[in-house]
């Protein structure tokens, strides 16, 4: 059997009558049947009369004018090419072919009919239903279920990619096979109900079929629960190789429950929309294809993967345990204890010597009206932490997704220190209630490094956090988290953008020099850094360092301008944190002292790389300066020593930690991208 090809909503259809015979037809409630009395008439017929059952509403339509027909059959109408009948019924039949319409044909003056045509009708109700109004419940026959619209008044059902693993002994995500092992797995799916009502059995030659298009078959899967009362079996009926499924008509009032899962996220070649159809098919004769006489369609949008900005409350902090980071680990633990989140340590057997947990993964989430759960995006970087997301994170209600390039080379810019997201912003009247994704790229026309296209396409295709490309290729490592971060302002809905600034550093050092602290020493008490005494005077008198940092400030300002434009920020939204960089052999920047902007943000508690700046009156003047900027906003600054375990390997606190946060309370389907 071929699945039906026509997918339009067949709400009106034509039935052909023939004088001297009776035609049987199935009528679906909510549709209209048209029949042409003129072409069905015998030769010599000039007028016709009508008789019909109480349950059928019959109208004679001539030249666009409709006239309702009483049941007694006394009235006559002149036959003309424009004479048609419009039939409808309001209730499902209790028996097959129990409702009738009879057309009697007459000659000019004759009182007895010369012939007649009969139509025997069976009325049934068919409705494929989903949660189109997004309240978590499947409603009945929502008129907008076949389309999908954004916004607070929007309609259309939502589907989750079933990318978690509810069965611990399976190697991959639940959506990777066609089996269901538990009720928990069904809870990740969206419900769909096929409602039918009618006589105990349909007339011979009719069947009901559920089907999907070939292009949707790798994006959606449908399951049916067999024997709900005698130990359930979950049968996979649609998706992958299965394009259609014949539904057994049970008679009376019936509701068949199906479970629908998403198989893949929106991407460059997939908008995220999938449709499922039910058709009533009519059989004519052996060897002739079945024809659809009624189709009902529902549409789902697959929920996008959503990133969580720093302003959202933290749930868990992840950090790697290394041979050399015991003190760092202890300081992070102390910081986390001040907040209400948990510390999760990735031990050496799992990290295999890879400390950069920020670079391997990005935490996000997916959500539908009935359910939501966190989903980790695995970077194509694939360092020694590459098994961590699948082995330690993927599990019940914790999903996994990745994008790997086939032919492109993976660079440092594909690490997820180079993937951040802003808090919610409004730009020129356009709202971004979930913020905007920020990724680092190369300078236009420079032919430098860029994040791989498959990841950029994936982020763009999610639609709800329109990405902004920044310029990060001027840095040796090339990550956006090396020059910017966002902090919440406690108790307010506001935030600030923190940016690394070499000019702020030079300005601070000149002020200290002017106040007589030119001999203040940096990196005090650190044996391994350098045998040279590095003072404010030495830094300010180093011409090449000054020139390099003027260039780096231009790179920072280029990004500042993009961020101001794309996030609608003003200067008062930005706080400059002093930073210094030195140029490597490729003319790219690496931090001269621990880069304070590369911090971990846990509500009001900030874990900031300890800069080991010049000691003025027994205090680091950089720490004092930063406290003076941030503490008046209600933030608490904790400076963490990362110099030997992270800074010397070209990363800081943010690079070595990762935070899973609570999802937005705002529902993504309420926005208009």
From Swiss-Prot:
InterPro entries attached to this UniProt entry: Cupredoxin, PAD, PAD_C, PAD_central_sf, PAD_N, PAD_N_sf, Prot_Arg_deaminase_cen_dom
Tissue: Expressed in various tissues including muscle, uterus, spinal cord, salivary gland and pancreas.
Gene3D superfamilies given in the database record: L-arginine/glycine Amidinotransferase, Chain A (3.75.10.10), Protein-arginine deiminase, central domain (2.60.40.1700), Protein-arginine deiminase, N-terminal domain (2.60.40.1860)
Binding site for Ca(2+) 1: 131, 133, 135, 139
Record-level GO BP terms: cellular response to leukemia inhibitory factor; estrogen receptor signaling pathway; negative regulation of chemokine-mediated signaling pathway; negative regulation of lymphocyte chemotaxis; transcription initiation-coupled chromatin remodeling
Binding of Ca(2+) 3, residues: 164, 166, 188, 397
GO molecular function, one term: nuclear estrogen receptor binding
Listed EC numbers: 3.5.3.15
Keyword Cytoplasm: yes
Positions where Citrulline occurs in the chain: 352
Subunit structure: Homodimer.
Name by which UniProt lists this protein: Protein-arginine deiminase type-2
Lineage of source species: Eukaryota, Metazoa, Chordata, Craniata, Vertebrata
């Amino acid at each position: 059997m071929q699945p039906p090809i026509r997918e339009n909503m067949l709400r009106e259809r034509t039935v052909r009558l023939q004088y001297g015979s009776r035609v049987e037809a199935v009528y679906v409630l909510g549709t209209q049947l048209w029949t042409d009395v003129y072409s069905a008439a015998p030769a010599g017929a000039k007028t016709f009369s009508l008789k019909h059952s109480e349950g059928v509403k019959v109208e004679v339509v001539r030249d666009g004018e409709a006239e309702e027909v009483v049941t007694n059959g006394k009235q006559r109408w002149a036959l003309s090419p424009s004479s048609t009948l419009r039939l409808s019924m309001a209730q499902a039949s209790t028996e097959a072919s129990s409702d009738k319409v009879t057309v009697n044909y007459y000659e000019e003056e004759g009182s007895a009919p010369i012939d007649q045509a009969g139509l025997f009708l069976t009325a049934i109700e068919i409705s494929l239903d989903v949660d189109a109004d997004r309240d978590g419940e499947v409603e009945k026959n929502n008129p907008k279920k076949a389309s999908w619209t954004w916004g607070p008044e929007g309609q259309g059902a939502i589907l989750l990619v079933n990318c978690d693993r509810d069965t611990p002994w399976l190697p991959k995500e639940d959506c990777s096979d066609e089996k269901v092992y538990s009720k928990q797995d069904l809870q990740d799916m969206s419900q769909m109900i096929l409602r039918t009502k009618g006589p105990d059995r349909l007339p011979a030659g009719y069947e009901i079929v559920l089907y999907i298009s070939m292009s949707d078959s790798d994006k959606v899967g449908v399951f049916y629960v067999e024997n709900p009362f005698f130990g359930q079996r979950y049968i996979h009926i649609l998706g992958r190789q299965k394009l259609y499924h014949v539904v057994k008509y049970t008679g009376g009032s019936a509701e068949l429950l199906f479970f629908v899962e998403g198989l893949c996220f929106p991407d460059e070649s997939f908008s995220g929309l999938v449709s499922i159809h039910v058709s009533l098919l009519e059989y004519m004769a052996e060897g002739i294809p079945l024809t659809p006489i009624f189709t009902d369609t529902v549409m789902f949008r697959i929920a996008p993967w959503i990133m969580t900005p720093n302003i959202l409350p933290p749930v868990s902090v992840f950090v790697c345990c290394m041979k050399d980071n015991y003190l760092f680990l202890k300081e992070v633990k102390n910081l986390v204890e001040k907040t209400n989140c948990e510390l999760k340590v990735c031990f050496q057997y799992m990290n295999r010597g890879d400390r950069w947990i920020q670079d391997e993964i990005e935490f996000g989430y997916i959500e539908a009206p009935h359910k939501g759960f966190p989903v980790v995006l695995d970077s194509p970087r694939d360092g020694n932490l590459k098994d961590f997301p699948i082995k330690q994170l993927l599990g019940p209600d914790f999903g996994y997704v990745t994008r790997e390039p086939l032919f492109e080379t993976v660079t440092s810019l594909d690490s997820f220190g180079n993937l951040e997201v802003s808090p919610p912003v409004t730009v020129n009247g356009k709202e971004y209630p979930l913020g905007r994704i920020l990724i680092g790229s190369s300078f236009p026309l420079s032919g430098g490094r860029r994040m791989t296209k498959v990841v950029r396409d994936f982020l763009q295709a999610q639609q709800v956090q329109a990405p902004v490309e920044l310029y990060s290729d001027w840095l040796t490592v090339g990550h956006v988290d090396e020059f910017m971060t966002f902090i919440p302002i406690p108790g307010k809905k506001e935030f600030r953008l923190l940016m690394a600034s070499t000019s702020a550093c030079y300005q601070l050092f000149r002020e200290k020099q002017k106040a007589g602290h030119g001999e203040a020493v940096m990196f005090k008490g650190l044996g391994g850094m350098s045998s040279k005494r590095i003072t404010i005077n030495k830094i300010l008198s180093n011409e090449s360092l000054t020139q390099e940092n003027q260039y780096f400030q231009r790179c920072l300002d280029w990004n500042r301008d993009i961020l101001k434009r794309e996030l609608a920020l003003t200067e008062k939204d930005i706080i400059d944190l002093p930073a210094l960089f030195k140029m490597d052999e490729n003319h790219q920047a690496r931090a001269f002292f621990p880069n304070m902007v590369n911090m971990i943000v846990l509500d009001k508690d900030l874990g900031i790389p300890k800069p080991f700046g010049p000691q003025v009156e027994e205090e680091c003047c950089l720490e004092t300066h930063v406290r003076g900027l941030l503490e008046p906003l209600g933030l608490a600054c904790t400076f963490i020593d990362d110099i030997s375990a992270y800074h010397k390997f070209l990363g800081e606190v943010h690079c070595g930690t990762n935070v899973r946060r609570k999802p937005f309370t705002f529902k993504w389907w309420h926005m208009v991208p």
